[in-house]
Amino acid sequence: MDPIQLLFYVNGQKVVEKNVDPEMMLLPYLRKNLRLTGTKYGCGGGGCGACTVMISRYNPSTKAIRHHPVNACLTPICSLHGTAVTTVEGLGNTRTRLHPIQERIAKCHGTQCGFCTPGMVMSMYALLRNHPEPTLDQLTDALGGNLCRCTGYRPIIDACKTFCKASACCQSKENGVCCLDQEINGLAESQEEDKTSPELFSEEEFLPLDPTQELIFPPELMRIAEKQPPKTRVFYGERVTWISPVTLKELVEAKFKYPQAPIVMGYTSVGPEVKFKGVFHPIIISPDRIEELGVISQARDGLTLGAGLSLDQVKDILADIVQKLPEEKTQTYRALLKHLRTLAGSQIRNMASLGGHIVSRHLDSDLNPLLAVGNCTLNLLSKDGERRIPLSEEFLRKCPEADLKPQEVLVSVNIPWSRKWEFVSAFRQAQRQQNALAIVNSGMRVLFREGGGVIEELSILYGGVGSTIISAKNSCQRLIGRPWNEGMLDTRCRLVLDEVTLAASAPGGKVEFKRTLIISFLFKFYLEVSQGLKREDPGHSPSLAGNHESALDDLHSKHPWRTLTHQNVDPAQLPQDPIGRPIMHLSGIKHATGEAIYCDDMPAVDRELFLTFVTSSRAHAKIVSIDLSEALSLPGVVDIITADHLQEANTFGTETFLATDEVHCVGHLVCAVIADSETRAKQAAKQVKVVYQDLAPLILTIEEAIQHKSFFKSERKLECGNVDEAFKIVDQILEGEIHIGGQEHFYMETQSMLVVPKGEDGEIDIYVSTQFPKYIQDIVAATLKLSANKVMCHVRRVGGAFGGKVGKTSILAAITAFAASKHGRAVRCILERGEDMLITGGRHPYLGKYKAGFMNEGRILALDVEHYCNGGCSLDESLWVIEMGLLKLDNAYKFPNLRCRGWACRTNLPSNTALRGFGFPQAGLVTEACITEVAIKCGLSPEQVRTINMYKHVDTTHYKQEFSAKALSECWRECMAKCSYFERKAAIGKFNAENSWKKRGMAVIPLKFPVGIGSVAMGQAAALVHIYLDGSALVSHGGIEMGQGVHTKMIQVVSRELRMPMSSVHLRGTSTETVPNTNASGGSVVADLNGLAVKDACQTLLKRLEPIISKNPQGTWKDWAQTAFDQSISLSAVGYFRGYESNIDWEKGEGHPFEYFVFGAACSEVEINCLTGDHKNIRTNIVMDVGHSINPALDIGQVEGAFIQGMGLYTIEELSYSPQGTLYSRGPNQYKIPAICDIPTEMHISFLPPSEHSNTLYSSKGLGESGVFLGCSVFFAIHDAVKAARQERGISGPWKLNSPLTPEKIRMACEDKFTKMIPRDEPGSYVPCNIPV
């Protein structure tokens, strides 16, 4: 029998597969089989949106075509029969034409590293196919499933808003106030200079959107769907069989034959279990276009929805119904809609089915508690006939008598209409407001006797608080017949707490927070129902106390918008001179079309191998044995490399590559498996058997390291003035400490490399995503015992780095190169997201202890500080992080008597490393926490204490470097003015007085960010410029393009210096072959240093060619180049910059480590929900001193992207470790970086007028890192809001808020009767699920 063919279309091209592997996902099929590499791998679990494509399906019954976005990483190709797939390549390209969304996202500066851009483009494209003029709500909803680590989202929204109606407006007009009016939050801006600069792009130049020019749905697929009789398709793979029934009868027969086989529609539940949990299903049943599974019908008893409907379709259906029917009939539907709007991203909602969501019964399911309290029923079918069962707590607990039978199929769900005097509410709390699994969720329903007030039925279910969804049915039963009033509230809360219990060591942790949410939700339910009763019967229903009403309102929610005040080019500047102009990232269009090539986009090399790692499952253990036999016996496995193979090459400097006798962290590299495919390598890695013997001590936290004196090297120390004497003369002394959690880099492109032996003289080429090609060259040369001139490292671009692609990348590259050299074959190594997060480490967790002596007016005269960073198991950059922390801890303040000491702690965690800001975001937060506490003690605002202690005019730092603080004062004054500080502070006070359960807070933070490497040698740079005879130029330099736009700026430099159009200048990438002996790209100086080298090369060429140019001033570069060639004058030049003068003597505690300082200030206003811990950033103003901006568009992108990354660090990004040292948060489903829902509603960025700095490139300043710290303005604004909540509740005295300020910490700091009501567990009496490190 001939195998059944799989037929679908990709970008209008027919695809026919005869031998389909059911385990093949669409993403690898597109990338490897079809070589469409524009669709990116970001996480593999549907959490980041990098792999978004559009699927189009034709329904022959309705004659309609449905377009929707999906995650290609979770889409089996077997599910695509009869569909049309559109990828980013299908929209347009640079060779033919661009689609308007591709053009606009690039020209609106919505790309930086560009790795997320194709996914963003496809999400927006799918929206435009359905809604050519979308609303802003539709826009933000469409992009809710896409993550970006670089831009801060705002320019992406700007690009997409150009498709909306009235795209120039924020669409948030309220009380007559709009973003286009120069009034903000009702407070008029009074200053003349607050008028914003012209936009960084011109909408008038954009291509129009013409829906008639889109790809048509393939007519062949329409004909097949309408004319060919449907029949079950079966695809057989090596391990898995895929069955696609096309009628309900065939589906029932398949389920009868294979009762244990899962029925999948979107693969969003089964897929992650298969990929991440190792679940195996030999048979998969996937229904295709079965009409009964898509039924939508209304009857007297309610609404019936087919189990095969996607969650997005359910959302649209319910939204339509609630608009048409009275509220009393649609209580359950409104509650479901509330959760559907935040559940996952658009891609997952379009893939996941209603039936799959119900049957999977995840403990944190958002819909199941609501469906259960709404008395929904499930319509089942099997060979034995139809059956109807309630969607009850017993069903959700999988009780056999209430569950589906293995051979039964869920056909549809009946959702009853609600009745008069019936109220249904939905609650959830997550780490992030959208596209995040709930920490706790709940569905609650109450029915009153006629007339209201007395409970007739009550149902309360919770998710996230147990191994299954839990019902408080006993509590509900005891409350039936009782009146609904506030007097009973405490009784209800205690009853529920007694019934819905959580063990102190419960999975997921956050136990006290979850207990508090259980009763906080119950309180909100009481308020919502009371409000509903009052609407029904104003005279006889309980009235809400005025201070309770705020608990019912959502947090501040408007559409995001921004204003920019950037530097404008001097009118006298030549029009062709690009310096200072907002020029688009020169790879922006290629990012948007998918044509930009990243490391793993490179075509496979002949006989290429794939390498993957086996990592330790223990944090500190002796390796007793390693059994490789079973793994080596698997087909396709070529070799397994251990430390024994590397021998003395297993170390380089302080780093060891593969474990020898011991492992020192979970994620320690044990061995490397090499096979002929990625799949086979990963299968073999699972078969490597390692036996461990645990060792003591196990040190995970900073406190444990201090206890065991486990430090790298000795302390670092700086001191100025006489601290001990100053403490004797101050009015007050306080001591405190703050813990700052670590942060994952979460670059969108994971660690990637391809090593290709050249087959001659031992030469080897390394194509790698790194910030430091020279270091990889050195480490590989040492490993292979080659001279460096035979090892060439090439980097075209990097899909995000932030400091995370230096040390560990080099180790991975050395091992991969060893494998390639040993076997004489190319070897590719691409880490999966979970592997990357487990192995690589991130920002150092930090502990700051401070003792401050100050006068009553707030002036700090003495400060004694101790800093500790959690370095992990190897030194890496930990000592440098401590050094930078100590040098920069003063931030914007003059402390006349300061002693600071720091230690890098050795622990059994993966080695932590550099991350944007490099110690300053942690050290600065310690200082600002101290300032804030001093303010509280003095009864002053933190802004007053900051002003009193701020550097003024020309001053010296605690390490005796002189600088001028004039720009710092300007930034502070301008920020205070632009944010209307005093007016808004008063408005916040009024808001807080009127709202008991919502509070607002505001904070203004100054910034003095030193820029420099600390060493002349580490600051040197080189460049190479060629001029060709056609008048074009090629430039090479040592900097790495990782999203910051350094290549664009270098071409701007060449254009200015050679007076050559930018279109005539090209830059291919970075290579140790063209520019040797480069330094790492980082520290905000990449454009500074390399730009000065490029400038030097250009000036050398100009000087050399000056006689020729002067003789023919009207000539072109083609003329001048030809003349030079004819005269045997070289048209190539090397440029060099030796580095800024930089030094620091740690023995003397003085030096000049930094070339200059970036100054700035940020004001943020937030709103918090005291019951749940949610927060919303309402508005942020940022003022920066940038010198002379080389490219305002790129510089604003750096400031804004860094701010959002810093905001994530200080609020929602939380690493979670087990007490045994295992990292739990290994992907976007567990680790939450900011998404579109998290950005400030208003963002106002201003640059000071240009200022001169003679030593830097065109008086510019590096802005890559400084903005991260300004994110702490959100942290301290939340602190201010929490303080207001505590003061209202009469809670005095100090309290400690550590970073990140997650919903858990916010909620638990807002102490109230509910936090006092929950049971508390004695520390030390239990083993927690997770620990802070």
Curated annotation (Swiss-Prot):
Binding positions ([2Fe-2S] cluster 2): C113, C116, C148, C150
Function: Oxidase with broad substrate specificity, oxidizing aromatic azaheterocycles, such as N1-methylnicotinamide, N-methylphthalazinium and phthalazine, as well as aldehydes, such as benzaldehyde, retinal, pyridoxal, and vanillin. Plays a role in the metabolism of xenobiotics and drugs containing aromatic azaheterocyclic substituents. Participates in the bioactivation of prodrugs such as famciclovir, catalyzing the oxidation step from 6-deoxypenciclovir to penciclovir, which is a potent antiviral agent.
Protein name (database record): Aldehyde oxidase 1
Phenotype when changing E983D: In strain: C57BL/6 X CBA
PANTHER family to which the protein is assigned, alphabetical: XANTHINE DEHYDROGENASE
Annotated GO CC locations: cytosol
Organism the protein comes from: Mus musculus
Residues recorded with modification Phosphoserine: S1063
Pfam annotation, one family: FAD_binding_5
Annotated compartments: Cytoplasm
Family: Belongs to the xanthine dehydrogenase family.
Cofactor binding, note field: Binds 2 [2Fe-2S] clusters per subunit. Binds 1 FAD per subunit.
